[in-house]
Amino acid sequence: IDPGHPVYPHVEGFQSIVLLKNDESSRPDTNDWHKDLTFKSNPPFASILHGVSVPKIGGDTLWASMSAVYDSLTDGWKEDLEGLEAIHDMGTFRNDFYKEGGINSVNSALKKVGSAVHKVIEKHPISGKKYLNVNQSFTRNILNVSQGASDHILQFLFQLLARPEFQVRFHWQNNSVAIWDNRITQHYAVNDYLPNSRHMQRVTIINDKRVK
């Protein structure tokens, strides 16, 4: 189990259980497409999310299949993306550190939390399916291409996730639990429930014991 999150609070006495509690005083910030913690060199392979107390209407979570997104690409795009790598960092979590202590706090956090390099196209170690491995929240730029080319490529890839054909949507009830493969999916928490509150707890699992 991942030992904790660099920004989000945890359940008292349980460092590895992340507390995601949002309302008007603590507005949600997960309403964009992302994979959990890809700024780490070894991101979690799975996430488990528990709906402790959820709104009756709204607050759904969407998941997108990144293998389906990859399969939708033309052969030309697949060839061009194969072998490329991208830098992932903590993204807008910078805002939290800036509020705490200005730019010095941001710089310290960047050094402490670190960045990671991941392949743009990965192969799932169990299914063998290829999947797209970039996300809006944490993928900063593609290595060894110009900034303009990197921006163009990433924006093209990000907008593909908007297609409903690649998505599934889950409506939470109190004590619902969702488990997903963090490698081959991305998710989006819909921010449509304020002023109601949404109380979730999450753990992330680092190692897949099926992978030798």
PLM feature segments, named:
Residues 1-177, 182-212:
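Non-heme Fe(II) oxygenase catalytic core, chiefly the N-lobe of the double-stranded beta-helix
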